[in-house]
């Protein structure tokens, strides 16, 4: 009976990961509450469209830039790739072999052996793509990883100057 209980508890502990994977497979990470908020506040059209799913990303906009913030615990600078595809698609992903979800097993010393390994496998692989808006300056992209948080900043181009042209009115 204890083994059955342990299995049930372990399954429940991994439920958030399973739900994350299901949301990623569906390609949409927003909750029902998020959908309701966006519909109620007229945010139906996003300036930045996400492609695919995966790790949660916060996207912020200021007058001068866009910022993408993603948790990447356990990954080093060499494990993270940030690229630009098709001139307007920002790609953030873990490089080959990094974030495969398998934790390196500590060496058993002497007569010590593992009875159970339950700590969450870390780091997790991730891949996210975002189509950037027209005002994004693709030459002004920078990425910084600090304390397990990746921040990718995309500068905005200044808005085009509005040109006014006078048209002479003729009397017929």
Swiss-Prot record:
It is found in: Cytoplasm. GO terms for biological process: protein complex oligomerization; protein folding; response to heat; response to hydrogen peroxide; response to salt stress. One of its GO terms (cellular component) is cytoplasm. Keywords: Cytoplasm, Stress response. InterPro entries: A-crystallin/Hsp20_dom (IPR002068), HSP20-like_chaperone (IPR008978), Small_HSP (IPR031107). Residues 29-54 are annotated as: Disordered. Induction: By heat shock. GO terms for molecular function: unfolded protein binding. Residues 48-172 form the sHSP domain. It holds the Pfam family HSP20. Belongs to the small heat shock protein (HSP20) family. May form oligomeric structures. This is 18.6 kDa class III heat shock protein. The lineage of its organism: Eukaryota, Viridiplantae, Streptophyta, Embryophyta, Tracheophyta. The gene is HSP18.6.
């Amino acid at each position: 009976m204890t083994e059955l209980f342990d299995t049930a508890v372990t399954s429940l502990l991994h439920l958030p990961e399973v739900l994350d994977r299901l949301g990623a497979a569906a390609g949409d990470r927003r909750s029902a509450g998020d959908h309701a908020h966006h519909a109620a506040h007229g945010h139906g059209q996003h300036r930045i469209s996400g492609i695919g799913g995966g790790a949660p990303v916060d996207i912020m906009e200021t007058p001068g830039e866009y910022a993408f913030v993603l948790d990447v615990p356990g990954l080093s600078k060499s494990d993270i790739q940030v690229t630009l595809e098709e001139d307007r698609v920002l790609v953030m992903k873990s490089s080959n072999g990094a974030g495969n979800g398998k934790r390196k097993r500590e060496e058993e010393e002497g007569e010590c052996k593992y009875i159970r390994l339950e700590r969450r496998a870390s780091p997790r692989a991730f891949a996210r793509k975002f189509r950037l808006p027209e005002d994004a300056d693709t030459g002004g992209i920078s990425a910084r990883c600090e304390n397990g948080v990746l921040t990718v900043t995309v500068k905005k181009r200044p808005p085009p100057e509005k040109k006014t042209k006078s048209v002479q009115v003729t009397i017929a």
